[in-house]
């Protein structure tokens, strides 16, 4: 059931900006449902709904109810969402009737969704496991014979696909054909920006997307592309501002907090970075990436003791990840706790022996512990792996 019930809480309402508490409640509820705790998610959303009658809260609660097998309750919530914001629950209703095996009713609601602001991409629909129960039906095949997507939508989707699999040249070919038949409208500029971003031309992307945003300042997809381009152009201050626009506009994506935190740590805004990571960890307390980033921010700020706490917590949660050992080893290395560093580098190398930096740092730790022969052994392994930084250590300590 958990595999079939892919979370698709439908967060954005046309013309609606959610308050930050609503955003947090939805993110937390989604995390609980993903973790297989639908009862806790429903309890949280019940309380949230008493404070704010948002369609997104009802669609999220419907997903938690589906995971519990409460299809009737989920249908009621999707219908309630539709009353608050037209068509916001249609895709969810389509999914739930597909799960029930009712192809006709499922496709009725899917058609309503396709004609609305909530229209999903073809790829997203076809990959949605909820429709696996009806995708072999004649009604399903007939449905997809209709032209649901414009040439612009199809071209952009194809460009995104080729970029996602690393075939940038093919994405350029699609863009070229697209431009032959259409004027230089916003879709063309956006599509070209995707190709330019994938090609490393971030300065052109920033110029073009800024132009698009001047006429449509709140467009989520434009803001996301701009933030990526700013990051690629080594402009973390600009990227953090763009991510702030996305967050304050009510976009429901916990990952935005980590992206902004990474920008803040690059600009030296440690408190802001840790605040964003803290928000993310409230939602996903066991997340390896967030705990790692928190530790690295603390290292950069000079609080190595706090960094060790984050890295140790990460290791407790993810004991088979070599990078978690590497993170803590590097922290011990900075504090000159050589024996502890050696132990963690060794554990990391047991899991990932091809890490030349781990061999180098373990060798340095051994050298500082007075174990020159063992250190030289590690230096030679690192050198054979192509690590040029080890050369001085070899020449000074291991060549007699």
Regions found by a protein language model. Give the residues of each.
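Canonical tetratricopeptide repeat
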Residues: 60, 92, 126-128, 191, ...
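Terminal, low-structured helical/coil segments at or just beyond the last alpha-helical repeat
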Residues: 125-161, 368, 372-400
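Position-specific recognition of the canonical hydrophobic site in helix A of tetratricopeptide repeat
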Residues: 33, 66, 98, 163, ...
